[in-house]
Amino acid sequence: MTFPTTIHATVGQSIIHKTTRLFAGCVADALHELLQNARRAGASRVDIRRLDRDQGTILRIRDDGRGIVDPTKLLALGESGWESDIARSEDPAGMGVFSLAGRHVVIRSRTADADDGWQVTIPPQAWESGEPLDLVPAVIAKGTEIEIELSKAWTDELAQAVKSAAQFYPLPVFYGEERQAHESFLKEAARVENWNGCRIGVFLDKYTPHREQARINFHGLTVPCRLPHVHDADGGRGWYAKVDIVDAANLQFVLPARKEMVQNPALDALREACEAAIFRTIAREGHHRLSYAQWLRARELGVALPEAAPFLHLWTPRIAETNDIFPGERIAGEPMVIMLTQSANIEQCVDRALKSGDGLRGSLVRAMPEFAGYGWYKAFPRVRGLSFQVETDNETFHYDDGASVPDDLSSGRVDTITLELAVRATADSEEPADILAFPADVLIIPTDCCSDLDDVAILLGTDCAITPGELASLLEASCFWPNEDCDADSHYTQQAACEMQARFAANMLLLGEDAAVLERVREAIRQHVTWLIPKDRAISMHAVNHLVEAAFADNDDAPSVDAAE
């Protein structure tokens, strides 16, 4: 077999037989393409009408632009026929008319310098067959008029499609006698900048825009595009950009339908320009809570920002259910000590230990690693490590996040529990950390990542005076983690079960087995039995070995009434 010496790109003639698949086949695509052509032709307005005729429903689109100069290029796939200025600035593909492919279409047009207009009728099969179509004279004012036979689907979608197409379109659009609403694509922008033939609008929203939200507007044609979103490190505020393209030839759309942007250096430059515009908007406000990394990025883009506002939030312990960090009240202008983040059970026990006294010489605040690098953040003392030292008759061990515990560890009283905090004076300090010790009375040690309190060791100091209710609440906050499997009980049911188990465990440890069992029985009766008892009636019960006896008691039997309650 002999191979050719060269090859080159060509367009196969068979592509003409696939023109009905170049666009999605919806009326919205067709309207956008025809409106763009009217704008390029210099029209001052576009009139759209729905005509109900005997042969069906017709969509007529009329503009007063320059008209179609060369009708031979009308159906030439890839030949736009536009003058060089428009070809340079807008990159027309010469495919827009094929958004009508497969439909019965009549096109009339006349240029300003022509004595007569012309008309061509395109039957549905002609779009793919390539058959010759006759041009005939037509009486028409300057401009172009297109009539399209509507299917039921296009008829149903037409009104909304016209409204959407006209929303950001720069020319007046009339549907029947009614002018369609128009608004600026950058409406409600906090600030607008001009950049390389574009207008960049900066908007305030702490949430990242949805990936399908339109971020770029091309004369009424809007597309989603990934553009920068900058937000405060603590989620208070956010900024994002939208772009109105005016004349930017290097920003290109994927052809033919222009529903997404071509990923090229021009788009990369636009993203960087949007980012810089956001930082300039923030600079004008004079304050921010950006991360140190974002602050450095602004400097790279030539935008000088002050350091983030120097405040932090009071440290509050996490709960296992969400594992989220909930900021406490704002702390500023006073001594602070930055607390590192630990698992929920450790944070809950640390919080209880530290409430017994101060000793830290400052408010304990939640760490914000995003601020590491700012001068004011580096200057605060910080907890660099912590552990609980537990002493029993037989041994001493330390417990911290990730530490192993003795295999035979079980719930009960121990000699002492001590919280040890390693505190460093500043982030850059080369001095050894100070070790601060605080007496603790409770330590909860889960041995598995679940809500089963049977796998939790509860250690109490000798002098611990915690109540059963307090201990039950501490257990739930430290250990409850709902099972989200599809076959699991509801969140409410799981939480109720955990609460009951926590109360039982607390009663067992603090009151003894008999008291714990009796309280659990009372709770079960209150929850599952009392609603069956008629109002103002009393029932006495006797239960042993799964045998339950019950009888109505006299109404004046106060003990029975009290027990039922």
Model regions: which residues?
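Bergerat-fold GHKL ATPase/HATPase_c domain
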Residues: 1-43, 54, 72-75, 255-258, ...
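Flexible, glycine-/charge-rich segments associated with ATP-binding catalytic modules
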Residues: 1-4, 105-109, 125-172
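Short beta-strand-loop-beta element adjacent to the nucleotide/active-site pocket used for signaling
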Residues: 52-59
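Conserved DxG motif in ATP/Mg2+-binding regions
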Residues: 59-65
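Flexible ATP-lid and adjacent glycine-rich G1/G2 motifs of the Bergerat
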Residues: 66-129
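GHKL/Histidine-kinase-like ATPase module
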Residues: 155-272, 313-335, 340-350, 429-447
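Mixed-charge (acidic/basic) macromolecular-recognition segments
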Residues: 243-312, 460, 468-515
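Long C-terminal appendages of very large multidomain proteins
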Residues: 358-361, 378-565
